[in-house]
C-alpha cells in the first residue's frame, strides 16, 4: 500500500480528562457513542486497552444491511494522553488527549484506499462528534 497523507480530526470536549478517558475506552460506553447517526450501531466491542492489547468493534447499519469489524492492536497506551494502534490491515492511527480544560481530542489516521479521503474524514468526524455529545450529555 502506498503511504498517503494522514487524516486528522479533532474536537474540544468540555469534561474532565478522567471522564473522557473512561468513556472513550469502556466497551459499554463505546457501544453508545461509536456511530455516525441513529442508523448505525456498534453491537460488539472488545477492548484490551494496554500496549500489545487487541480491540474489536463490530460496526454497521442498525437494519443489518451492512457491517464490518474494526480490529487491531494497541502499540502505545499512555493513560489520559495517547493511544496509538495498528489496524489488522496495517494502517496506523493515534489519538491524543490534551491536558487542561477543555480537552482537545485529536485522531490522526492513515486512510484506506476506499472510500474517498473526504468520506473517511467525514465518517471519523461524525464519530468524534457523537463522542463529544455523549460525554457532555453525561455531565448535565
Model-found features: residue ranges?
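Hydrophobic ligand-binding cavity/cleft-lining segments
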Residues: 1-40
Amino acid at each position: 500500500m502506498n503511504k498517503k497523507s494522514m487524516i486528522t480530526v479533532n474536537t474540544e470536549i468540555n469534561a474532565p480528562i478522567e471522564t473522557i478517558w473512561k468513556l472513550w475506552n469502556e466497551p459499554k460506553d463505546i457501544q453508545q457513542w461509536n456511530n455516525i447517526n441513529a442508523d448505525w450501531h456498534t453491537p460488539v466491542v472488545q477492548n484490551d486497552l494496554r500496549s500489545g492489547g487487541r480491540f474489536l468493534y463490530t460496526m454497521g447499519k442498525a437494519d443489518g444491511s451492512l457491517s464490518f469489524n474494526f480490529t487491531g492492536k494497541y502499540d502505545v497506551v499512555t493513560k489520559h494522553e495517547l493511544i496509538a494502534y495498528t489496524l489488522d490491515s496495517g494502517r496506523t492511527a493515534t489519538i491524543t488527549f490534551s491536558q487542561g480544560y477543555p480537552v482537545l481530542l485529536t485522531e490522526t489516521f492513515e486512510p484506506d484506499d476506499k472510500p474517498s479521503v473526504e468520506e473517511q474524514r467525514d465518517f471519523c468526524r461524525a464519530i468524534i462528534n457523537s463522542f463529544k455529545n455523549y460525554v457532555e450529555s453525561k455531565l448535565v
